[in-house]
């Protein structure tokens, strides 16, 4: 059976090699006659422009694609091995976004030179790594704490990047294409800098081979075998962070390869660590090589697109196709080394107090604000004048925060994975892509089509996830991988459209950032009605949400029909996410963090967890919307970005508090 399972991906890999070789041959032949290849490779004639392009552009581009692809496959295995999570990749600990933030700052400051950008990328990645290690150190760098700290710090850096883009859109236009990954080369300098750095990374990885193997076991077993677990994790993750920063500096952010290559290596039968490291590096090099040759062909027949976009568009369908054949997927137990507050009693009193606090926040957001003369408390006629402007956006923020938080609770309980959230399922990105696509297809003012276009995008995404995950027995982790594949593909497509320079993208940039600016009374009423219906259904799923985190075997033992239950919960979470996304755009924080905040406050039983998460999500977004209107008055910051700035410090405080 295992041989038959491994045969299909092996044939697929061979097919990809043949296609990549054929495309390379065709692209090189179009650029230069085959009779001149040898001369152009070794000693190009400076009077023949085709030979110069062949030597200084095409060949270095081929070499850099192989080097970067191999490096991404290598660091993907490192992250997945150390964190024991199949969803871990170079962006998991915030490495890529930290490096990108460093380079964004150097771009704004107009600091010249390749060494300046390389130093900025390394500095950004290392600062993020130090913050993550500092948060998780008190818990002996447990995988769950590292993942959560890395995710929220990554969100924080991403929010800063997005904020800089909103206020410096024209100045950072060139960053859009680079952010999605570009392998364009003008000499051999990039290759000459990168290959010795990668070789050093490979040598250090081989030195860490035994500790890395033991880190794939349970923490207790690894310690009993004599491994200094915290030190080993620190060394392995530091190595992965440095390699990732070097790759980001070289070509920008190329997603998906770090996730896909290790999974395909495992499917090919590479169970032991060393063969998996080697095979994942080869697969990563092959995928990036193929993607870049497709781009060279597209540039000639259509237009230039970014490498990261094509990589995601190739990798996502491949992963969806291969998912049913992936047998063993596991994630770390969310309770490993995870001390949380004692279970809270008197839940009703806490819920009432939270409701009162939320009501007070709404009143303050409605009445307290700034105008041309300074701070003022609006009342009477002034409040009546302000209500049509403030009421819709405050209610939109409240409803969206509640729905995203409840959706996050459902998804995390359904999958048992601490990285699970509405945006990981790809539904938010699918809805956003539907809206942006409609903007490009419909002439004139297309915002009237926002709701149907976004709903269709979310529905198509959900359908693809259900088909891909259902073919393999509807495993929760297959579902997460399918969602992550689609989310990566949609995000890369959105970034590619941003890089196109089309002025219409500026119209939706704030909406994508989670802005309540365009909320209307009619939209808020529709959202409120849908929210009430969906929240009324949620308590009916209480038994399922209580039993599913105990595992599939336990659920079957008590008579639960797993597949229909998982489909029903997925549909509920998808409807909550899509409705919230249509209202204020694809947020990237509340659905992930609100359930964790409620849990760390001591609410772990199903209904208390859901209720407190909903209150936390609503309060967070209402406060974020108010801050977004007031902090830089009269300018505004989207609530989605502000919720990240507000929520991340509190979440990190809770993580640190647990480790004392």
Annotate each language-model stretch with its function.
Residues 2-660:
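Alpha-helical transmembrane segments in inner-membrane proteins
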């Amino acid at each position: 059976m295992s041989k038959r399972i491994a045969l299909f991906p092996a044939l697929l890999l061979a097919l990809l090699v043949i296609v990549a070789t054929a495309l390379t041959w065709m692209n090189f032949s179009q650029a230069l006659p085959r009779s001149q290849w040898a001369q152009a490779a070794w000693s190009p004639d400076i009077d023949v422009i085709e030979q110069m392009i062949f030597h200084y552009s095409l060949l270095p581009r081929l070499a850099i694609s192989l080097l970067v692809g191999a490096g991404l496959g290598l660091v993907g295995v490192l992250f997945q091995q150390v964190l024991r999570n199949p969803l871990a990749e170079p962006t998991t600990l915030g490495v890529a976004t930290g490096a990108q933030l460093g380079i964004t700052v150097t771009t704004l400051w107009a600091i010249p030179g390749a060494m300046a950008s390389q130093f900025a990328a390394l500095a950004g990645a290392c600062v993020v790594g130090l913050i993550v290690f500092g948060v998780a150190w008190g818990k002996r760098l447990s995988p769950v704490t590292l993942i959560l700290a890395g995710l929220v710090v990554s969100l924080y850096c991403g929010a800063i990047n997005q904020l800089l883009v909103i206020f410096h859109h024209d100045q950072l236009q060139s960053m859009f294409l680079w952010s999605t990954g570009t392998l364009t080369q003008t000499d051999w300098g990039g290759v000459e800098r990168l290959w010795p750095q990668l070789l050093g990374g490979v040598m250090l990885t081989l030195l860490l081979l035994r500790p890395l193997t033991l880190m794939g076991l349970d923490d207790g077993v690894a310690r009993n075998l004599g491994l200094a677990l915290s030190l080993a994790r620190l060394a392995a993750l530091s190595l992965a962070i440095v390699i990732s920063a070097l790759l980001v500096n070289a070509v920008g952010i190329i997603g998906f390869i770090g996730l896909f290559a290790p999974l395909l290596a495992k499917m090919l039968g590479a169970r032991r660590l060393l063969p998996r490291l080697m095979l994942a590096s080869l697969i990563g090099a092959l995928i990036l090589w193929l993607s870049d040759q497709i781009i060279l062909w597209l540039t000639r027949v259509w237009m230039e697109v970014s490498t990261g976009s094509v990589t995601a568009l190739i990798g996502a369908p491949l992963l969806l196709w291969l998912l049913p054949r992936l047998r063993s997927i596991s994630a770390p137990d969310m309770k490993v080394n995870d001390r949380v507050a004692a279970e809270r009693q008197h839940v009703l009193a806490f819920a009432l107090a939270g409701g009162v606090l939320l009501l007070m926040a709404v009143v303050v957001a409605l009445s307290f604000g700034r105008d041309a003369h300074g701070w003022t408390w609006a009342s009477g006629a002034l409040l009546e004048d302000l209500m049509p402007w403030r009421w819709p956006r405050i209610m939109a923020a409240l409803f969206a925060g509640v729905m995203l938080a409840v959706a996050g609770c459902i998804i995390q309980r359904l999958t048992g994975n601490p990285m699970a959230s509405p945006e990981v399922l790809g539904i938010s990105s699918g809805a956003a892509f539907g809206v942006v696509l409609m903007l490009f297809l419909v002439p004139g003012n297309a915002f009237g089509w926002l709701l149907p276009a976004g709903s269709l995008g979310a529905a198509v995404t959900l359908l693809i996830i259900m088909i891909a995950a259902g073919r393999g027995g509807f495993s929760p982790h297959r579902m997460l991988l399918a969602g992550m594949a689609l989310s990566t593909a949609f995000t890369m497509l959105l970034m590619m459209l941003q890089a196109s320079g089309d002025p219409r993208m500026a119209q939706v940039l704030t909406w994508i950032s989670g802005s309540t600016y365009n909320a209307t009374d009619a939209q808020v009423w529709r959202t409120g009605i849908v929210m009430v219906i969906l929240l009324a259904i949620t308590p009916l799923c209480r038994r399922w949400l209580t039993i599913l985190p105990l595992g599939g075997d336990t659920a079957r033992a008590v008579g639960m029909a797993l597949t229909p239950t998982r489909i029903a919960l997925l549909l509920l979470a998808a409807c909550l996410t899509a409705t919230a996304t249509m209202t204020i755009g694809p947020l990237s924080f509340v659905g992930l963090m609100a359930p964790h905040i409620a849990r760390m406050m001591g609410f772990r039983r199903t209904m208390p967890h859901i209720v407190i998460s909903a209150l936390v999500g609503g309060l967070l977004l209402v406060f974020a919307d108010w801050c977004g209107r007031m902090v830089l008055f009269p300018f505004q910051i989207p609530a989605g970005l502000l919720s990240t700035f507000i929520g991340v410090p509190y979440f990190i405080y809770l993580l640190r508090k647990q480790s004392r």
